[in-house]
């Protein structure tokens, strides 16, 4: 399995953006991914050093549309803590730098 298949997408919420100040980044990962696989994938993709990985399973919520009920998809979320001497992960592009080019 390729390392780019393990990390699905970054989680962009108010809480996760506040955690970025502490070098903690949140990603949605495969349901079968382990902490070791997430660590290796983040280190290889972003060229950083990982200090710690916390993983949680988020269950799907019940949703209704009229009389029809269903569930949203369950997901697995990983919070990756980087070492203090590691570089930051650039999730957001700086618009000012692109305009100056």
UniProtKB/Swiss-Prot annotation:
<dbReference type="GO" id="GO:0006412">
    <property type="term" value="P:translation"/>
</dbReference>
<dbReference type="GO" id="GO:0019843">
    <property type="term" value="F:rRNA binding"/>
</dbReference>
<dbReference type="Pfam" id="PF00276">
    <property type="entry name" value="Ribosomal_L23"/>
</dbReference>
<keyword id="KW-0694">RNA-binding</keyword>
<dbReference type="InterPro" id="IPR013025">
    <property type="entry name" value="Ribosomal_uL23-like"/>
</dbReference>
<dbReference type="InterPro" id="IPR012678">
    <property type="entry name" value="Ribosomal_uL23/eL15/eS24_sf"/>
</dbReference>
<dbReference type="GO" id="GO:0003735">
    <property type="term" value="F:structural constituent of ribosome"/>
</dbReference>
<keyword id="KW-0687">Ribonucleoprotein</keyword>
<dbReference type="InterPro" id="IPR012677">
    <property type="entry name" value="Nucleotide-bd_a/b_plait_sf"/>
</dbReference>
<protein>
    <recommendedName>
        <fullName>Large ribosomal subunit protein uL23</fullName>
    </recommendedName>
</protein>
<keyword id="KW-0699">rRNA-binding</keyword>
<comment type="subunit">
    <text>Part of the 50S ribosomal subunit. Contacts protein L29, and trigger factor when it is bound to the ribosome.</text>
</comment>
<dbReference type="InterPro" id="IPR001014">
    <property type="entry name" value="Ribosomal_uL23_CS"/>
</dbReference>
<comment type="function">
    <text>One of the early assembly proteins it binds 23S rRNA. One of the proteins that surrounds the polypeptide exit tunnel on the outside of the ribosome. Forms the main docking site for trigger factor binding to the ribosome.</text>
</comment>
<dbReference type="GO" id="GO:0005840">
    <property type="term" value="C:ribosome"/>
</dbReference>
<dbReference type="GO" id="GO:1990904">
    <property type="term" value="C:ribonucleoprotein complex"/>
</dbReference>
<comment type="similarity">
    <text>Belongs to the universal ribosomal protein uL23 family.</text>
</comment>
<keyword id="KW-0689">Ribosomal protein</keyword>
């Amino acid at each position: 399995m390729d390392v780019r298949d393990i990390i699905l997408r970054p989680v962009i919420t108010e809480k996760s953006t506040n955690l970025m100040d502490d070098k903690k980044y949140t990603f949605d990962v495969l349901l079968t991914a382990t902490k070791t696989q997430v660590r290796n994938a983040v280190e290889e993709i972003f060229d950083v050093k990982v200090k710690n990985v916390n993983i949680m399973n988020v269950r799907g919520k019940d949703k209704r549309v009229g009389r029809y009920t269903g569930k949203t998809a369950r997901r697995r979320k990983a919070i990756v803590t980087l070492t203090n001497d590691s570089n930051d992960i650039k999730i957001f592009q700086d618009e000012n730098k692109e305009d100056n080019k």
